[in-house]
Amino acid sequence: MPVNIKXFNYNDPINNDDIIMMEPFNDPGPGTYYKAFRIIDRIWIVPERFTYGFQPDQFNASTGVFSKDVYEYYDPTYLKTDAEKDKFLKTMIKLFNRINSKPSGQRLLDMIVDAIPYLGNASTPPDKFAANVANVSINKKIIQPGAEDQIKGLMTNLIIFGPGPVLSDNFTDSMIMNGHSPISEGFGARMMIRFCPSCLNVFNNVQENKDTSIFSRRAYFADPALTLMHELIHVLHGLYGIKISNLPITPNTKEFFMQHSDPVQAEELYTFGGHDPSVISPSTDMNIYNKALQNFQDIANRLNIVSSAQGSGIDISLYKQIYKNKYDFVEDPNGKYSVDKDKFDKLYKALMFGFTETNLAGEYGIKTRYSYFSEYLPPIKTEKLLDNTIYTQNEGFNIASKNLKTEFNGQNKAVNKEAYEEISLEHLVIYRIAMCKPVMYKNTGKSEQCIIVNNEDLFFIANKDSFSKDLAKAETIAYNTQNNTIENNFSIDQLILDNDLSSGIDLPNENTEPFTNFDDIDIPVYIKQSALKKIFVDGDSLFEYLHAQTFPSNIENLQLTNSLNDALRNNNKVYTFFSTNLVEKANTVVGASLFVNWVKGVIDDFTSESTQKSTIDKVSDVSIIIPYIGPALNVGNETAKENFKNAFEIGGAAILMEFIPELIVPIVGFFTLESYVGNKGHIIMTISNALKKRDQKWTDMYGLIVSQWLSTVNTQFYTIKERMYNALNNQSQAIEKIIEDQYNRYSEEDKMNINIDFNDIDFKLNQSINLAINNIDDFINQCSISYLMNRMIPLAVKKLKDFDDNLKRDLLEYIDTNELYLLDEVNILKSKVNRHLKDSIPFDLSLYTKDTILIQVFNNYISNISSNAILSLSYRGGRLIDSSGYGATMNVGSDVIFNDIGNGQFKLNNSENSNITAHQSKFVVYDSMFDNFSINFWVRTPKYNNNDIQTYLQNEYTIISCIKNDSGWKVSIKGNRIIWTLIDVNAKSKSIFFEYSIKDNISDYINKWFSITITNDRLGNANIYINGSLKKSEKILNLDRINSSNDIDFKLINCTDTTKFVWIKDFNIFGRELNATEVSSLYWIQSSTNTLKDFWGNPLRYDTQYYLFNQGMQNIYIKYFSKASMGETAPRTNFNNAAINYQNLYLGLRFIIKKASNSRNINNDNIVREGDYIYLNIDNISDESYRVYVLVNSKEIQTQLFLAPINDDPTFYDVLQIKKYYEKTTYNCQILCEKDTKTFGLFGIGKFVKDYGYVWDTYDNYFCISQWYLRRISENINKLRLGCNWQFIPVDEGWTE
């Protein structure tokens, strides 16, 4: 329910109730009181500047800066007049009303009001409540006409002030008393926010898609309501005493778009939400959780002994009930309170993971930063928040009626310029560094040359002391030891709907005795530093190189030069790292008649040189190199710069780095195993827990290495990438300027005869830079991953293996020591220990960062290098090749059919010329009984012939084989079985098979693509995995030596059905046994894509006929119901006999996906991608084309979809968005409809009512659109069975009915 928010004018009279004179704890002197307004119970606004801990001169920009990393906005005159204070008050009230307009904001405010700080703190005797302490109360002056003023205490939860010295610095905190912080110790405290609603931070638009043009990044300004909600989340943490104080966390990643990389407080990461909390290690996460749990228990213990109160009017029983409700304690029959672990867990997750900036941004339709580390641009200011044509309570800046909702255009600086104004430069301060080197000029005699550099432009290297030391700690393992992991998911819907999170209390009287003990308060001290720091350097850094590529805006007759010093000393010269040919061409003066051809030549040369890349022979895990990076940024020494490619091949990725960081790889702390004499169960659990904790050690070590890599290595690589963008942009601007200068030399008559579009020049140059940046992205990403995998992970694995060896010894000794009690379990436990500790735990980058680009590069690294692929078939440029690097050659028969869409599929028919032979290198032949290997491929086999099912089930035919002298291996098919067979030199064979059902209504395998991976441990088992999951395992130890041919044959052999065929793709052989994690990862890598799939697993296509299949209601199809122009459902028919069963699929309406006019699909193919905007047409209702429409003015949660001839009736809407909400690999997709501010919902099958004026009709199980699904898809329960999941079925030769 909405909370009650009061409205005020600043000049309203004092009433000693909700308008008072408040003595702030930031009191600058005795007797100072500020006018305060209670807009919500226990929440007050004080329209005054925040001065607590600050000196008066610190409010001026000229005295330096507080922070090295952000723009600081100063205006000492702000909030000085009553008019400004009135505007501040009314603006804050409007922001609170905006927050109060959504259920999630209502719940946030409700919980803040109810979360009354504990009456006391660490200095309060445990058996007492104390109201007149600094973390609970504040003083107010009671003003009564004709009477002496009185001072009373006032208990509050939150006081909001205007900004401190820096208007762009919003901040939330409370009191530190005698070295203790109640907001971090479970007590909670009265919170204070310093806030400036009129100052808006500005951030870059961030696209996760690697292919997004760098020039499409836009600047967006914040919605002050979301900024305020961010601070209110801090308030909620503080009121519950779980606010995390002074715990800096090393940044997760320094992406291309990220700016500030210093360690960030954990409190900010939790409050922001999204992916940011993932940077916090599981052990740190658990330590924070356990501290909060212990603090809650301490509060419960205090409540159990409280018997008196300091301060009048304190009802002890009432406050005990208040705190029982607040902390969700349980009470036993004796009235004793304690923490229920499940209740605490729920409350903690709601507070830490439910209320986050990212969650709330989604609820309110507000654009926010992608990450807390995102780049900030100079802030802006607005004086128009009270103007409802600029900023509304329900929509903020993104006002639909002004066409500002789409793509958050209301927050887009370039679009909504009337909403803000720029801040004048004299009010903005940023920390800068002057990098100076001695130099002497002949003419001026200057003795130094300085380049001004912003602090955030420097390379960031995290301090080694900021990394966790937890790995080195010894641990005691007991039978009840738990893992250090926390589930950090809590949806915003749970917050809104969960009544357990609402205390429902009646607020107690807030008046108390005045607070007098100011000596207990620790007043903070804030120190400024100079805004400019000068440092001297000996040589030229990349900053000199970048500066030499810039030029003053008013310069004329600009020229390019290959000399750095020439450019630094002459303002009309720009340093270029491209060839002398480009320099000479650009500097050539040409006549007007040659101008157009000259421009084309300059641009062509720039395109050719900027997009150049070379391949590398000696560094196998880096596939390309950008040779001009060295001379562009002064990377490497002088020799390396001049021949960057050779230097890179010798020195590897390390030569790109400014600093080689010191890597911290601690010795892993040992385990002490708890002794349990005679207790068999406890002994076994202790062993099991030790193995689980061992796995956690591996995870934590990898996490530590990734944390160091991201913040000491990857940050350098990404800084290089960003500088290369700057460098290329500098080159482009210089060329544009040179072209402009050349054009301006001509007479007006000559200009009239020159046909040239300068916008086209700009476009072509930017297009070249985009292509170049994509190449640089690939190169830099590969370098970073290479450094991680070659220089860092091996060191970690060595330490972990040493730990495993010691743990194995200790566990086996522990088993022997307890042999008497374990009896027949001894050998089983020893085998378990040996098996568990035999293998390393594979490193998976996706567990430690959400950076999709880095994960993609890592996955490529894993699949192409670490997995030891010795044969990998790919279809490129119209031919089949081996992309493993081992150079197998191919013979392809004339009756093999290729489909280059979908990873190079090929079709084998049952004919003599439908065959492929891959001739392998002799270096990869396996002819030893001890050689392990794996094969992996995808297959699609057609449906059986209904009339000849016995032949289908009995005929076994080979599809892939590698046989030499009757020894080797083969893959064969026998009906619904996939069979793997190994044959040794003595003709002894061993087979393992996977069998799927042919009696399911809807099969997951018949005519559908599925992945098969077979792994072979010659001293152990052969395993068959289907779609990444282990299905069967058989021992192959008794086989003798196996010959393998140099040739791998793909051909249907011994197949009796002449019409039979199979499709195969993604075939790989690996030179070792892949483990389960690698198989699962390989399946994920191969199947993950932004293209959507049809029912069979092929790419979904535009302009193709499809029948619809509903995953939630599989036994129905959709047909046309003409009476109401809608889709109704009918049951699918089955074909069923003793051997087989299946449902008919080609039933009902036939749909065609069409590109919508505003589709984001910019590819030239006809593939449907996730997020595309589409129309959904129907071609079998009548002779004319029909389309699916949504009624624009519908107010129903769930309503019909209209099927009507294509028209432009404004009462209907037809633009849809095709989505894929689940990360799990699935062929399902969802169809969303939104228009302006309205979300209609997702397509589904549901029930709704239609009003015909004279009668109501109820329609059940009809084609509908529903908002209900949007909530359900965010939950984890059976989401794949929801009725909003659709698959598109094309007619296919492999499925006949």
From Swiss-Prot:
UniProt keyword terms in alphabetical order: Disulfide bond, Host cell membrane, Host cytoplasm, Host cytoplasmic vesicle, Host membrane, Host synapse, Hydrolase, Lipid-binding, Membrane, Metal-binding, Metalloprotease, Neurotoxin, Protease, Secreted, Toxin, Virulence, Zinc
Cofactor info, note text: Binds 1 zinc ion per subunit.
Known EC number: 3.4.24.69
Disulfide feature: 436-450
Catalytic residues, chain numbering: 231
Recorded superkingdom: Bacteria
Tagged with keyword Cell inner membrane: no
BP-aspect Gene Ontology terms: proteolysis
Consequence recorded when altering residue 1126 to D: Significantly decreased binding of HC to host SYT1 and SYT2 independent of gangliosides
Region entry Belt, spans: 488-537
Region (N-terminus of receptor binding domain (N-RBD)), start-end ranges: 868-1073
An example molecular function term from Gene Ontology annotations: lipid binding
Keyword Membrane: yes
Positions of the record's site feature: Ganglioside-binding site: 1268
A Pfam cross-reference name: Peptidase_M27
Gene Ontology CC terms: extracellular region; host cell cytoplasmic vesicle; host cell cytosol; host cell plasma membrane; host cell presynaptic membrane; membrane
Short motif (Host ganglioside-binding motif): ranges: 1266-1269
Region (C-terminus of receptor binding domain (C-RBD)): 1089-1297
Binding site for Zn(2+): 230, 234, 268
SUPFAM superfamilies: Clostridium neurotoxins, 'coiled-coil' domain, Concanavalin A-like lectins/glucanases, Metalloproteases ('zincins'), catalytic domain, STI-like
Reactions that this protein is recorded to catalyse: Limited hydrolysis of proteins of the neuroexocytosis apparatus, synaptobrevins, SNAP25 or syntaxin. No detected action on small molecule substrates
Other notes: There are seven antigenically distinct forms of botulinum neurotoxin: Types A, B, C, D, E, F, and G; new subtypes are quite frequent. Botulism poisoning is usually food-borne, either by ingesting toxin or bacterial-contaminated food, or less frequently by inhalation poisoning. In both cases the neurotoxin binds to the apical surface of epithelial cells in the gut or airway. Toxin undergoes receptor-mediated endocytosis (using a different receptor than on target nerve cells), transcytosis across the epithelial cells and release into the general circulation. Once in the general circulation it binds to its target cells.
Family classification: Belongs to the peptidase M27 family.
Listed name of the protein: Botulinum neurotoxin type G
Species for this entry: Clostridium botulinum
